[in-house]
């Protein structure tokens, strides 16, 4: 079975106003002691043989604050399988052609840039520290450094949002050579700066849904095939790491606030970097991964839920009432169903939570 490895890098220049992830703003680099703490945990989970993950994902925080030699130290400790996908999230303002070439030499073969918008005024509203010019330069530097697998993030339904802003951002990312795009609706998290002081000019729920459908159409038109609610790729460039999550595979997350599911059991590290550094943060068990998780995660994917696999894995079948509800969804344009596979359309993905409430 495939194994995905996630390494959390909780350091960043500044906290974006929409972000509620566990991180430490005001940092200009990653302490070597933190890297060694991650190596310690890698050794702990694989005392007799290396983990050899199929995918390795550096998330954050801002993982591009790592020095290339630190990334190499972690990759060497994990010993990923030949052909593994190794992704590094990066903020455009933190990279140079030299640093990107160093990451490439260290073993990183996929880079993911947090672009969000091509408009500097919007970036300032979001609290992003980069400019559109820096985003363009980062894509160009990544290509020159030898990256052929490049992803870019777009945020939708931002304050005073327009379709023109989306088009400008898509153009920047596509012209940059992106093979993959993640497009997310802005979500106001209670513990974020936006949660405490919401920005003016936010779209209504209906307007946000329209922006989402517009984005899906434009991305598909430009050759980025939708394979998950928020993810689009050129053929063959789907993000393998996140597919392990959505297909309910095994994944190990290391670092404060990192979550895992191994052998059907969930656990996580407490969000406490000091305790993690001092080897005083044992993982906390957090229940099991079961049939409900499988249904929820599979219906995020455009390929949908195989009812045959659902029955084979969990012994579950849809009831007569559930099947009747599915047919109602098909008639409403929210889903397709051939008797074996239930898949949500883009319109259905927008109201996925309401659909799941009837199926669970």
Each model region followed by its residue ranges:
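Short amphipathic alpha-helical interaction segments
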Residues: 316-328
